[in-house]
């Protein structure tokens, strides 16, 4: 990702300033953010900034010069011209929002991302369990095959493409019926611009799109677990005792097929926090 952003066309120093910036101004910005350094050295400095134990130059003119005000942390020891520092990961300042720390920007937007991820995983779990149970019960029928087809498509389609497709269909073509927006914020100012109001409808499309892939995985896991458990001897015994199919599934099958699903859900939640950027508008 680091190298990809650096090979894209455009000058970040020019983005910080404007088209009328002088060469002297551009050079100052490049020196401030390290854009004038070789790409390989920039990457090593980037890793050094993220590392809890980092190496810093004692030369005040060097880009990696240690300043407690800038990096925080404390110096463990020094040798020659290098200081070894213990610190929290340093995310620098944003060159798009000059002077604002990246850590602060993330802290401002992270709550909404967590809300989106939680909403997505809830949708994925509820629909995934329902469709997985239906698919397992009707194993081999057209219902099972239809659910399996939808699940396979859900796992295959990238989130960014699903986001574009769903926003176009439900936010543009069917907007008169759905009343959903293509873009929007979780909190929006009221008509008087005085207070932020929660807009649940702006959460529906992103949450559903982000939940498609984990939903598809949960469907497969629940279905396979259901089929495997239902073939066990104790399930046949439960049926022989006269328990209804619903009781067998609820009391015996689901409880014994949940472990892989719970493991998958915890892993998917972590990936959702990172992947939410593809569907957040």
What is the predicted function of each stretch?
Residues 1-51, 55-69, 170, 174-197:
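Hydrophobic alpha-helical transmembrane segments of membrane transport/permease proteins
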Residues 4, 18, 139, 163-165:
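Active-site-proximal flexible loops/turns
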Residues 8, 154-157, 273:
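Transmembrane helix irregularities
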Residues 20, 144-168, 206:
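Pore- or pathway-lining transmembrane helices of multi-pass membrane proteins that form conduits
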Residues 25, 29, 39-54, 102, ...:
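Hydrophobic alpha-helical segments of integral membrane proteins
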Residues 36-125, 129:
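An internal, D/E-rich "acidic patch" concept
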Residues 110-115, 119-143, 159, 172-175, ...:
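Alpha-helical transmembrane segments of integral membrane proteins
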